[in-house]
Curated annotation (Swiss-Prot):
InterPro entries the record matches: 2Fe-2S_ferredoxin-like_sf, 2Fe-2S_ferredoxin-type, Beta-grasp_dom_sf, Cbr1-like_FAD-bd_dom, FAD-bd_FR_type, Flavoprot_Pyr_Nucl_cyt_Rdtase, FNR_nucleotide-bd, NqrF
Predominant cellular place of this UniProt entry's protein: membrane
Protein's cellular compartments: Cell inner membrane
Domain 2Fe-2S ferredoxin-type: 32-126
Membrane topology note: Single-pass membrane protein
Lineage of source species: Bacteria, Pseudomonadati, Pseudomonadota, Gammaproteobacteria, Pasteurellales
Cofactor(s) for this UniProt protein: [2Fe-2S] cluster; FAD
Protein name: Na(+)-translocating NADH-quinone reductase subunit F
CDD domains found in the cross-reference section: fer2, NADH_quinone_reductase
PANTHER family linked: NA(+)-TRANSLOCATING NADH-QUINONE REDUCTASE SUBUNIT, NAD(P)H-FLAVIN REDUCTASE
Family the entry assigns: Belongs to the NqrF family.
MF term (GO), any: metal ion binding
């Protein structure tokens, strides 16, 4: 009897808790359809079921907000302005959004829960962003850890990007074995030295990452990227390798790849000021895009120079391209500095870190370095060193333009 009574009471308690949870859920979560009004334009409003995050809700309706980290809350790019609804800002957003911006309604769309109807504001250029399924034309090594991925846009389509812009690449769950990579023997030294062939990248979820374009707008029908593979650092070999870079390095001719874009803000100013481009590693990509666009499409007569840092001659690429541009344009020169030239390089050019080379061989004696515009993209250490050097020369922030996607 006591056992039966105990079971009955336990059942009643469980049922009561279930009813309570369902009641609370009905009050706290809107399970019906909601409306997101955009830019006070009735034609842009979208209706959808409640649930999920704002970033994904917009994407499901064909509105693609930039998110280099794929919605993880780490890149801080997916900022939108929420003027009504959306709830309170979360602590995870405050490292990317200032207190003033938070008061004005700015949020990370990947962190905003879609529970109720809301009103938001988006930049108009967002509505020009599209998705394409592209075909891999080639995926060749340009340096030890850098591949040039060349993609074919679907016939009749065009990615209307500006030089310095970027696209996002998507990848479904996958497993990549580094031993399967197609890498020419000339680049094997470091791969063998650190036994990088032993690594495997296993991804169990859909991922998205952003990459700056190396192509420029006149190169119709294709998208070119310079992708540096994110291998585990030698001092910490147990760190997982980069998910998207590993995936991209595994791509072969004929493979299909989904991209979205265009995005960007690393655009050239429309002035007559001198342009100084500074790059390193995969930061070559937006440098090539900008310089080709200025000299080949715009036929610019602005004075410009390009300063690129590499470890050795093996890590130099697009040399013939920039030599050609220099020969064809009196207003353009380019220089390479090797930080660790090999004996067989027989190198008689600049050596050392690129920020020091730029300063000692040009800016130190420049009559007005503060009047130049500086466009840079490279490893974080390079970027920091260049910015400090420019600040010491009195260059204002408005003349220092940085692309954080390279390196």
């Amino acid at each position: 009897m006591e056992i039966t009574l105990g079971i009955a009471m336990f059942t009643v308690i469980v049922l009561a808790l279930a009813v309570l949870i369902l009641f609370a859920k009905s009050k706290l979560v809107n399970s019906g359809d909601i409306t997101i009004e955009i830019n006070d334009d009735p034609g842009k409003a979208i209706n959808l079921p409640a649930g999920g995050k704002l970033l994904g809700a917009l994407a499901n309706k064909g509105i693609f907000v930039s998110s280099a980290c794929g919605g993880g809350g780490s890149c801080g790019q997916c900022i939108v302005k929420v003027t009504e609804g959306g709830g309170d800002i979360l602590p995870t957003e405050l490292s990317h959004i200032s207190k003033r911006e938070a008061k004005e309604g700015y949020r990370l769309s990947c962190q905003v829960n879609v529970k109720n109807s809301m009103k938001i504001e988006l930049p108009e250029e967002v509505f020009g962003v599209k998705k394409w399924e592209c075909t891999v034309i080639s995926n060749d090594n340009k340096a030890t850890f850098i591949k040039e991925l060349k993609l074919q846009i679907p016939e009749g389509e065009e990615v209307p990007f500006r030089a310095g812009g970027y696209i996002q690449i998507e990848a479904e769950p996958h497993t990549v074995h580094y031993k399967d990579f197609d890498i020419p023997k000339e680049y094997h030294e470091d791969w063998d030295k650190f036994d990088l062939w032993r690594y495997t990248s296993k991804v169990d979820e859909h991922i998205i990452r952003a990459y700056s374009m190396a192509s420029y707008p006149e190169e119709k029908g294709i998208i070119m990227l310079n992708v540096r593979i994110a291998t585990p650092p030698p001092r910490n070999p147990d760190v997982p390798p980069g998910q998207m870079s590993s995936y991209i390095w595994s791509l072969k001719e004929g493979d299909k790849v989904t991209i979205s874009g265009p995005f960007g803000e690393f655009f050239a100013k429309e002035t007559d000021n001198e342009m100084v481009f500074i790059g390193g590693g995969a930061g070559m990509a937006p440098m090539r895009s900008h310089i080709f666009d200025q000299l080949k499409r715009l036929k610019s007569k602005r004075k410009m120079s390009f300063w690129y840092g590499a470890r050795s001659k093996r890590e130099m690429f697009y040399v013939e391209d920039f030599d050609m541009l220099q020969a064809e344009n009196d207003n353009f020169v380019w220089h390479v500095a090797l930080s660790d030239p090999l004996p067989e390089d027989d190198w008689d050019g600049y050596t050392g870190f690129i920020h020091n080379v730029l300063y000692e061989n040009y800016l130190k004696n420049h009559e007005a370095p503060e009047d130049c515009e500086y466009y840079m993209c490279g490893p974080p250490v390079m970027n920091a060193a260049v910015i400090k050097m420019l600040k010491d020369l009195g260059v204002e922030d408005e003349n220092i333009l940085l692309d954080d996607f390279g390196g």
